[in-house]
């Protein structure tokens, strides 16, 4: 691994540990030339995930798009960035495991809703309002009633 500070290739691993989701390894490294320390993350690369859109088109899965939508739904809620990152990582690994790796966008939306329901009910309702294209107050009251039944 090349040192990001001096570009030397003489580096050594000082500490390794698996991530919380056990799908990556975090390594603490030290440069033997300049003695700088830096961290790397090693992840398993699986086949790329493709998303089948509602209009029939297929596009590459965009992890950043998913992250942005969840951050927007959880804005000003008691949800940490670490929790959001964990949701996105877990979803990404589940999607990679699907055979064929062409996943309908509805499956991804359902996975987000399921994750947000477990994480924060208000965030779940916010996401659902956009994902399910709510058009009036009755749509909101219907989903709020369903959430209250579970709680």
Swiss-Prot record:
GO biological process: negative regulation of DNA-templated transcription
A GO MF label: DNA binding
Residues of the ATP-cone domain: 49-139
Cofactor(s) needed by this chain: Zn(2+)
Zinc finger boundaries on the chain: unnamed: 3-34
Cofactor binding note from Swiss-Prot or TrEMBL: Binds 1 zinc ion.
Keyword Transcription recorded: yes
Pfam (any one): ATP-cone
Domain of life: Bacteria
Coiled coil: none
Keywords: ATP-binding, DNA-binding, Metal-binding, Nucleotide-binding, Repressor, Transcription, Transcription regulation, Zinc, Zinc-finger
UniProt xrefs under NCBIfam families: transcriptional regulator NrdR
UniProt similarity note: Belongs to the NrdR family.
PANTHER family, per the entry: TRANSCRIPTIONAL REPRESSOR NRDR
Protein purpose: Negatively regulates transcription of bacterial ribonucleotide reductase nrd genes and operons by binding to NrdR-boxes.
UniProt-recorded name of the protein: Transcriptional repressor NrdR
Organism encoding this protein: Anaplasma marginale (strain Florida)
